[in-house]
Curated annotation (Swiss-Prot):
GO terms for molecular function: aspartate 1-decarboxylase activity. It comes from Heliobacterium modesticaldum (strain ATCC 51547 / Ice1). Heterooctamer of four alpha and four beta subunits. This is Aspartate 1-decarboxylase. Belongs to the PanD family.
């Protein structure tokens, strides 16, 4: 049996741009992609904390160190610059792998800089926000 498991998460990213006229996808700073174990063209779920929208797209790399989180194409209608989003990828694992798997989770501040990372989330924990 295979299981679909949470593979990685970029928590509380700040949307920097929304580009309706681009072909599609989400642009993510390549440094953040590396830290969260997200690959170019990987399917990703976007959860908008501001309006509750949940949708899927694929990832394209943005300039390293830029902090860019840009929703492109039709997805640009579901976010506004400044919105807080959670970006989640999933993997398919056999039962033994799934039982050993620990996702990669990074937490960002308001400028999309990494402030913490984790390998396991616990119910009831409040994530670091990076807000003063």
């Amino acid at each position: 049996m295979n299981r679909i498991m949470h593979k990685s998460k970029i928590h509380r990213a700040t949307v920097t741009e929304a580009n309706l006229n681009y072909v599609g996808s989400i642009t993510i700073d390549e440094d953040l992609m590396d830290a969260a174990d997200v690959l170019e063209n990987e399917k990703i779920q976007v959860v908008n904390n501001n309006n509750g929208a949940r949708f899927e797209t694929y990832v394209i790399p943005g300039p390293r160190g830029s902090g860019v989180i840009c929703l492109n194409g039709a997805a640009a209608r579901l976010v506004q610059p400044g919105d807080k989003v959670i970006l989640i990828t999933y993997g398919i694992y056999d039962d033994a792998e799934a039982r050993q798997h620990r996702p990669t989770v990074i937490f960002l501040d308001d400028q999309n800089r990494i402030i913490a990372d984790a390998r396991r989330e616990k119910a009831g924990e409040t994530a670091p926000t990076g807000e003063a």
